[in-house]
Amino acid sequence: MSNIVKAEEKFLSISKVIDSEISTVLASNVNGFQKAFVMSSAIDIIKEQLSDEYMKPIMALQGTSLGFKTDQDTVKKQVGGKWVAEKGPGYPMEIVKECLIEATFLGLEVTGNQFNIIGGNMYPTREGFGALLDKMKGLKKNFT
């Protein structure tokens, strides 16, 4: 078996663990301290799974409409008397991890520009709210 197939199987296995933890929290009918315990336990498990190796392809989604955008995607510099935008550094992996966990616990996806990172914090986007509304059974959109 090739290394690529092994890596894909490993990532798929990790993804299933993470998705299971998120589903457990989202489906949970507990409140108060019980909810805090369930959520904090799930966050610990997810953080263990989000290795640098696993995060590498997610970090590649930073700064794209197919992934998620940030306020660090571009940097404006003055070149020859004109301001030009250049690719910025983006956010470090630890901040992206925190925002990623927060977004997924709200039911947002990592793809499709469903959240942005601004000032190191996660904010749902119009696309994210639209996706959440699409998941609500019985909700009908009526734009007249």
Model segments located where?
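Glycine-rich anion-binding surface patch
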Residues: 1-144
